[in-house]
Structure formats: C-alpha cells, structure tokens
Amino acid sequence: MTGKGRLVLMIAFSMAIAGIATNRAAAQPAGHLNQIHHVFVIVLENKSFRETFGPNSPAPYLSKTLTSRGALLENYFAIGHASLDNYVAMISGQPPNEDTQRDCPLVTEFVPSRPEIDAQGRLLGHGCLYPRNVATLADQLERRGLTWRGYMQDMGKDASREKETCGHALLNTRDKLLTATLSDAYADKHNPFVYFHSIIDDQAKCDAHVVNLNALKADLSAIASTPNFSFITPNLCEDGHDHPCVDGRPGGLISSDQFLRDWVPIILNSPAYRSDGLIVVTFDEAGGGEAEDSAACCNEVAMPGARLPPGRNGPGGGRIGAVLVSPFIAGGTASAQPYNHFSLLRTAEDIFNLPHLGLAGAPGLRAFGRDVFLQRTSSQQH
C-alpha cells in the first residue's frame, strides 16, 4: 500500500472512532469561556430544586455558601430517570434508552436499531455498553491533547466487589455494584465512563483515567498534574442517594453537604482552580414523587421508538438546579435561563474548543452564557 493509501485509511479510521464528533464543527469558545482551562464537575443524587435550594434546605453550604460565591442556575433540568441515563448524557450527549433508564441491572451490549449515528448525533437502540463509534468527552479531550480523570469515591474499597481503578460489572452479568454494602458504597451506575467501549477496551487507559477519589488531592497539588476535566462522584451515602446510609449516617442532603464542605475547599485552594478553574455542582435527577419530577426544558424529546419518554412518566428528569463557582463568576449571580445536562456537556466542549456530541449539538440548545460568566481577567479573581 502506498503512503497516500495508508494516510487515507488512517483518516477514515479516525473519523469512524470519532463517531458523532466528526459531523459537528467545533465551536469557538466565547470570551467568557476561553479563560477557563480546568473544569471540575461534582454530581450528587436525587434531589429537586425545591429540596436543595428552598428555605428549609438541609444543605446550607451548597444552597447558601457556594451560591453566594458563585452562580445559581435556577432552571437547570435533568434529562431522564433513573441515574445512568443522566450520567451518560453528561459525557456523550446520548439520550435515555429503556435500559439506561433502569440503570442497567443486567449489563448488556448496546443494540443499535440502525448501524449509523443519525443526523442529531444519536445512536438509536437500547442497551448499556455503547460501541466504539459513540464518542465521549473523554475521547474528545484526548484527541485534543488535553487531560481528564473520573474520581470515584469508594471504588475498590472492597477488592472482592470491584477494582480500585476502572471498576465495573462484567458484560452479560447482573450488576452487583448498584447498591452499597457496609464495606463499599461505590456504584458503577454513577460512573459513566465504564459504559463506553472507547474507554474500557483499553485497560491501561481506563485504569489511568478512572480512579479512586483518593487520587484527587495529589493531582490538585500542581497545575501540571490537574486534569483539564475532572468528574467527581461521591459514594452512595455522600452523594445523597441513600438516606439513611447502610452505616447509619443520615445520607441525603445532609451527607451531600458534608461531602462538599470536605472537598470543595480543597479544589478552591488548588493552583489550577485559582488560575482558571470552574466548579459545577449539580444532581443527576430530581427525587421521585413530586409534580416537577419529570419536567424538562430545552425541547427535549424521546428517542424514536422509545417505549417510555425520558422521564418514564414525563419528558425529562425534573428541575434540579446547579451551582457554578469560578474566578470568572461574580458571587451571588442567579440565572433563570433554562439549561440541562446536554447544556453542561456543550459548555465543556465550548471551553475546550471541541465538537458537540449528540444532543449537546441540538439546535437552540445553549451553553452557559453571559448570564453566568463575567468578562474578567485573572488579576480580578476573588
């Protein structure tokens, strides 16, 4: 084969792996985003906006301290129920399917209803483990020469359940990592990276990038060792999912708030955050049983042929809110602009000048904008 022929094949292969990203031009970051070079996303569990940010909130650090330092997105929505479909959306732009809506109790391959990704960047079908042609934000960052890590609290704490790195249930088995034990409260349904072949098929890559939360402190010690994108998942007690927790702690928002009190100051004091960081704290979905539980925004629709809408009994995952803290955000900012998890992905992609994956590229969907960020220089940090 000639050198030219090999080059053509290499380009074709790269485009196939890039999948969704290949037909979506990268957006040039707006002025309020191109100052940010380190993003930290912390995802908590199962609370509505009213529970978290209402007058009787049991989470004063999140609802008062952090909002006074940053921005509160009052109309930020989840995109479905239960957990896994929301986590998948945050890093891939893929919508809910009937298996991710149920948190994939049986881990199966994704079965496409058609082999190609559609014009909206979706791979239609059902299943848990997405094929290699479904790209993630992690894949995009690597191709751009940028760094990422997923930090999972408790992962590998009980070595008989899962590894300390890249811990996940095996294909075609019942997932035993969906609930907490006294020795280990890690849940792989809250770790979106392990549901993509593009990540788990390279064991060394997955082990290096999907790690226990204990690694975060050392990584934050210098700008050079801090990933450009960090995705932080507490365990099933400290993310608020369980209440009470298996070890007797209260769980819910009380334990979530304590997790933030413990970890957010460490990030705030890190060189990377102080230079050019953005912290996003949000929830996967609203809690059950409320009128707003399945509310949606941003023209979200179900996948064609879906048996259920994204929220099972409604169009979305409920109004949950989000708090953003950054040297480039004025404390006490509040925005009523509608956003959702696809907006979060779109924002991260715009920050790093990446194409929009899946429904992050939906027409009319907005990245976090000037309603949130100020045009500030690094010398104006607070």
Please annotate each region the language model reported.
Residues M1-K4:
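N-terminal secretory signal peptides that target proteins for export/translocation
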Residues R6-V8, A25:
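Residue-level detector of intrinsically disordered/flexible regions characterized by low predicted structural confidence
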Residues V8-G19:
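Bacterial N-terminal signal peptides
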